Amino acid sequence: MTAVLLPWGDARAEAHRQGGRLAADTAVRDLGAGPVRLDLAGALGRTLVGDLLAPGAVPGHDGAAMDGWAVAGEGPWVLGAAIVAGAVPSDERLTPGHARPITTGAPVPPGTDAVVRSEDAAVDHAGFLVRHTPSTRRHVRPAGEEVALGQVLFAGGTVLTPPRAALAAASGVDDVLVAPAPTARVAVLGDEIVGSGVPRPGQVRDVFTHTLPAVLRSFGAEPVATERVSDDADHTARVLDAARERLVVTTGGTAGSSTDHVRGALDRIGAELLVDRVDVRPGRPMLLARRGATLYLCLPGNPMAAMVGLVLLGGPLVAGLLGRPLEPTGSVRLAVDVPNDRPGGLVLAYRATPDGAVPASHQTSAMLRGLADADGLLVVGSGGRVAGDAVPPVRLPWT
C-alpha cells in the first residue's frame, strides 16, 4: 500500500467515487438489498432510483385561478349555475353572453374566454353580471401549466424532500422507488474511553457512540450497531473482519503509536487502502479502505479531527453509495484574516456574520466547543487568507 497524501478536495471526490463504485459493484453482483418501493410519506429523505415521471398533468384540467365568474364573450352576461372546486368537468359549452359563478381551482367550462374576479364585477338590479373594473388577464390555469403528462419530475439520484413529495402527489404519484439506505456500523477504539459519568484522570468520555450514528443517518445511511473496541491488535482486526455492513466507521487508532492498530488490522484482513491520509488538519490521519462489499472509513480519535473527517469524507461516501451527486462546496468570504503557516489545508468551524465568515473560538483537534455552535466548516489553504478572500466551505449536515 503506497501512502499518497491527498488534497482534501481530491479525497472528497475519491470518497464519492468509491461509494458509487461499491454501489455499482454490489448491484451487478446482486449483493444485498435492491431498490425498495415506498409510499411518499415513507420515502421522505430517501434517494430516488431512476427518473420519476408524472402520471398526470398539473393541473389536470383548465381551471379557475380566482374566485369569480367564468365568462364567454362580452358582458353584460346572463348568469348560469355555479361551478365549485371538486366538480366533475362538464362538456356543456359556455356560449357568448353567458357567465357562471366559479371557485378557485374549479374546471372552467368549454368556451370560457376568461374568469372575471369577484372583486371586478357585480350583479346588477336586472340580474346581469356587469364588469366594473377592466382587466386583460384571463385568470385561467391551463391544464399541464405546471407539469405535463409524462414529464420527468425528478431525476434519479434526487433526494425526496417534502416539497418534491408534494409535487409528486399533485401529479398523481402514490409511491416511488428509492435506494436502500446503506447499513453502517460504528466502532469506537480506545482503552481510555469511558461511556458515562465524569472521566477520571487519564480517561476521556465517549463522545462518538451517541453522535456518529445520528450524523450518518443525516447523510442517508442506516446505522445498525455501535461497539467499543480495546487498543488491541487482535480485537481490532476481529471487529473489522466480522463487519458485514456497507460502511464501517471507526474512531481512533489511525496514527502511528504503539496503541494504533487500525492500519495493521486493515492490512491483516486484506482490505485495499484507497485514501491514506488527507492533507488537512485536524483530521490528517484519516483512512478509507475497502474489502469486498464493505467500505471502512477510519477516523482519528480526537473529537474535532473525527468530525472533520466524517463530514469531509463520510458525507460524499454515503452520497456515492446512494447514487446522489457530490454536493458542491461553493465559497464564503472571510470577515477576518486567517493565518496558516503550515502545509496543507486548515479546517475551521465558522460562524456566519453580516461581514462574512468568522472562525469560532476554542478550536483544536481535541476541542468540540467551536463546532458546537458553528454554521459550517471552511478550509484555508497554506499561507493563510486575508479578510475579503473567498474560501471553500463544507456544509454541516445538522445545520
What are these regions (language model features)?
Residues 1-174:
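Phosphate-interaction motifs
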Residues 1-17, 212-220, 247, 263-267:
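N-terminal intrinsically disordered, low-complexity, charge/repeat-rich segments that act as generic
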Residues 62-64, 89-95, 108-109, 122-123, ...:
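Solvent-exposed alpha-helices and their adjacent loops that cap or buttress functional pockets
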Residues 63, 126, 326-399:
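C-terminal terminal segments
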Residues 101-103, 131, 155, 186-189, ...:
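Short beta-strand segments
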Residues 139-250:
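Phosphate-binding glycine-rich loops and their immediate beta-loop-alpha structural context
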Residues 218-330:
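Short glycine/threonine-rich loop/turn motifs
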